[in-house]
A protein has these predicted regions:
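Extracytoplasmic "Venus flytrap"/periplasmic binding protein-like
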Residues: 2-68, 83, 98-104, 108, ...
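Short helix-initiation/N-cap motifs at beta->coil->alpha
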Residues: 13-22, 113-120, 206-221
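Beta->alpha turn/N-cap motifs
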Residues: 37-42, 213, 230-235
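Hinge/lid segment of periplasmic solute-binding proteins
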Residues: 38-92, 101, 119, 138-146, ...
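Short glycine- and hydrophobic/aromatic-rich loop-to-beta-strand nucleating segment
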Residues: 91-95, 100, 165, 265-267
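Short helix-loop capping/hinge motifs at secondary-structure junctions, enriched
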Residues: 99-108, 131, 200, 270-277
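Glycine-centered hinge/linker elements that transmit conformational signals in sensory
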Residues: 122-126, 176-209, 239-241, 250
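C-terminal lobe and pocket-closing loops
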Residues: 234-242, 254-260, 266-358, 396-397
Length: 398
């Protein structure tokens, strides 16, 4: 690091599928890294006393809790934290502008107050879904077995459906937070709405079809889909795809609720280089620390510091719509919509989230395939998940 030339950083890359296994092996061998990226399992490491309580390090680093967005802390108790999200992402609607113009339909709204209802969204997806003869999904002669362009594709993990569930008054957990809540009426209906895009309206590909299709950016650029709902991390690939793309608010027209999310950097108590680890942390999480870090915050990531959402100059620094990964409407649809309507992300808040969500994701495959209704599948999986449910870290439903 040019800012700290006396600090030498040894990097280690671990594939995501092996990450936790490898990290646990290093810890068991007394060879834990000084600093590590981490997912929701970090809070258990905090409870086990393996990592520093970030609140205890704030003064040393010249930081304050108020420097960061209030919904972005990975806390394992009210006074103990693994730290704030390193770099934010959020769920968003991305689209191919040309598909909309060719279909003669209005572009997705970028302001929350103008957001489509779910029914309006489905109608738009029908108009944008085309068979090989050019008929859209609203046409009575539409051939659902020969589709060349889908109206929408979506990620099937929690980050996609939870904004809709939270906005509808549902939750990942039930109201008493002692069991899964995805089988509750409001939550199950949202999951069913997504499944119906595939199996009823035929505006989204089946799981088998989707597996044979490329990434979000490539699918949008190739006009295999007109819209895609998933994480903002896709913006870097969209920037490089050559696609004429845009972003809009999610199709939620009442009680718009969403979240920032992301992993974080943790510092292990076993480190012999605490001061150097703190400096590395500050360098990696400062959007203005270097050209490379700045580039990441202007394409792949979003900041976690509050000033980058409240100071107009700071907003423009990373979210100016003159930047290639920040299309027209980005500041309204992504920055403002998320900042104004964010709650704590489900994976940050729910205890034992990794273990629970592995079971939920497997059960949802039956929903996406149309073999079971959302209510059926989520009611069945409760028998496996509820022994893992221990509430939330905040004490509030998520």
């Amino acid at each position: 690091m040019e800012a700290n030339p006396n600090i030498e950083v040894d990097l280690m890359h671990i594939p995501s599928e092996d990450f936790l296994t490898k990290l646990n092996a290093m810890i068991a061998a007394g060879e834990a890294p000084d600093v590590s990226y981490s997912a929701s399992w970090k809070c258990q490491m905090g409870e086990d006393g393996l990592i520093y309580n970030f609140y205890d390090l704030l003064d040393d680093m010249g930081l304050s809790k108020d420097d960061y967005l209030s919904t972005c802390w990975w806390n394992w108790s009210p006074t103990e934290s693994a730290g704030p999200v390193q770099a934010n992402v959020t769920t968003n609607l991305m689209y191919n502008v040309d598909c909309f113009e060719e279909a003669g339909v209005d572009l997705p709204p970028t302001k929350v107050e103008d957001a489509w209802s779910w029914d309006e969204f489905v109608e738009m997806a029908q108009k944008l879904t085309l068979d090989t003869e050019g008929r859209n999904a609203a046409d009575p002669d539409f051939d659902a077995n020969n589709i060349k362009q889908y109206g929408v594709m979506f990620g099937t993990d929690w980050n996609v459906y939870m904004p809709f569930i939270l906005s509808a008054g549902g939750g990942y957990l039930n109201e008493s937070m002692d069991g899964l809540g995805l089988n509750d009426e409001k939550s199950a209906q949202i999951l069913q709405n997504f499944a119906d895009l595939i199996n009823v309206y035929h505006v989204s590909p089946t799981a088998v079809q989707k597996n044979a299709m490329p990434s979000a950016a490539t699918a949008l650029a190739a006009k295999q889909t007109a819209m895609y709902i998933d994480g903002s991390w896709n913006h870097l690939d969209l920037m490089n795809s050559g696609c004429n793309w845009g972003v809009g608010v999610l199709p939620i027209d009442e009680n718009y609720t969403t979240f920032f999310d992301g992993g974080s950097l943790i510092i292990f108590k076993s480190t012999k280089h605490l001061e150097a680890s703190e400096k590395l942390y500050l360098w990696l999480t400062n959007p203005e620390s270097s050209e490379r870090i700045t580039e990441l915050y202007r394409t792949l990531w979003m900041p976690v510091q509050t000033e980058y959402y409240t100071d107009p100059d700071k907003i423009d620094f990373w979210a100016s719509e003159e930047l290639p990964a920040r299309p027209e409407g980005f500041q309204d649809a992504i920055v403002k919509a998320t900042y104004d309507h964010a709650v704590v992300a489900t994976e940050i808040n729910v205890k034992n989230f990794n273990e629970i969500n592995t079971l939920v994701s497997s059960a949802l495959e039956q929903v996406w395939s149309g073999k079971k209704t959302a209510e059926e599948a989520m009611t069945e999986v409760k028998s496996q998940t509820d022994s893992l449910v221990e509430g939330t870290y905040s004490g509030e439903r998520s």
